[in-house]
């Protein structure tokens, strides 16, 4: 519980600013290997863990979902839109769609995390989980320009997929982006 509270307090803060979470979010390599700035991995893990802690909050049910299939942020936001249609015919008419689009259009990692934090807060209020391991991998890949479009496209595909698609296949279809140098 204390670790989760420390992680929550670090949401929106720079990697390394909260000593209580260093063992969770910092790489243990030499300064010569890692450099002065946070690594892509540190930024991705820090963001994913702190947003998970924010998302989990006081929810009794686990907000990290790895059951049956990976649930990207796009798929979780789709679930949020469909759970609160309020007379709308399409998920794209739900206000959360504009928030997802703002996150996808974010030009910097910092602005992406601000938009992601807003979406995660909404997911937490609705008790809709997402796969934070996948989210960390997506955030890592987003930071590599040659992989960014693939991550964004997958989030968009997962939002666009209808609940009927998921029911027919038994899972949402996800594409892994292979690691390459």
Residue ranges and their predicted role:
Residues 2-3, 19-23, 37, 61-66, ...:
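Short coil/turn segments at secondary-structure boundaries
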Residues 4, 18, 22, 42-48, ...:
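Short runs of predominantly hydrophobic/aromatic residues within well-ordered alpha helices
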Residues 11, 15-16, 29-30, 50-58, ...:
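Short alpha-helix boundary/capping elements
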